[in-house]
Swiss-Prot record:
Domain N-acetyltransferase: 14-161
EC id: 2.3.1.36
Gene symbol of the encoding locus: HPA3
Location in or out of the cell: Cytoplasm; Nucleus
CC terms in the record's Gene Ontology section: cytoplasm; nucleus
Residue(s) carrying N-acetylserine: 2
Organism name: Saccharomyces cerevisiae (strain ATCC 204508 / S288c) (Baker's yeast)
Modification after translation: Autoacetylates in an intermolecular reaction.
Signal peptide interval: none
Keyword annotations from UniProtKB, A to Z: Acetylation, Acyltransferase, Cytoplasm, Nucleus, Transferase
Recorded catalytic activity of this chain's protein: a D-alpha-amino acid + acetyl-CoA = an N-acetyl-D-amino acid + CoA + H(+)
Protein name as catalogued: D-amino-acid N-acetyltransferase HPA3
Length: 161
């Protein structure tokens, strides 16, 4: 049995779909887990506003959920948006968040979520997709280097925000 076969077996149980209004409870559960993973706590109105934006067709912020088809559980999400840039004529897609539950990691869920975002970016006519990750998140970077390339850029943020 090759190293890829266990991932493939589990991968067949994963379905990724765009977030719908009925997914709010499942998404909220993952959103709280994600905050714990990121060692942060956000006010409840951030979750409420973010989810409302996902389902508002006038807002260019989308979410996708990964589900285990055997259990029906939501096991991961990706959030993405497109925006103008001075580097391309067409807009680009920024994957704002990517999260997979601890029990579902290294089973192909992250890859399926990224592939979903890539597919949606292609549909939008904005195939350039980028994201950032924590420098110490080596497990995720093992996947990222298979589906994208690492740049030499360093991210800076305004003080206090």
């Amino acid at each position: 049995m090759s190293n890829e076969e266990p991932e493939k077996m589990v991968n067949d149980r994963i379905v990724v779909k765009a977030i719908e209004p009925k997914d709010e409870e499942a998404w909220n559960k993952l959103w709280k887990e994600y905050q714990g993973f990121q060692k942060t706590v956000m006010p409840p109105e951030v979750a409420t506003t973010t989810f409302a934006r996902f389902i508002d067709p006038t807002v260019k912020l989308w979410g996708a959920l990964a589900f285990d088809t055997e259990t029906g559980d939501a096991i991961g999400f990706a959030h993405y948006l497109n925006h103008l840039t001075s580097w391309h004529v067409e807009e680009v897609v920024y994957m704002n968040d990517l999260y997979v539950t601890e029990r579902a990691r290294v089973k192909g869920v992250g890859r399926k979520l990224i592939e979903f975002v890539y597919s949606r970016a292609d549909e939008l006519g904005t195939p350039a997709v980028y994201w950032v990750t924590d420098h110490y998140n080596h497990r995720a970077q093992l996947l990222y280097t298979k589906v994208a390339y690492k740049t030499d850029k360093v991210l800076y943020k305004r003080n206090g925000y």
